[in-house]
Amino acid sequence: MNEVLIQAFVNRIRAGMMTIEQVPIPYQKEVQERLNDD
């Protein structure tokens, strides 16, 4: 998977600019795991 894209989604969710539902489905699991790790 694209590390830069995943990290960008994580950063946007943390900043309140996106929700997990707005992340493309193929990336949702990885993004959710990274959010839960912190």
Where are these regions (language model features)?
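Viral virion structural and adsorption modules
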Residues: 1-38
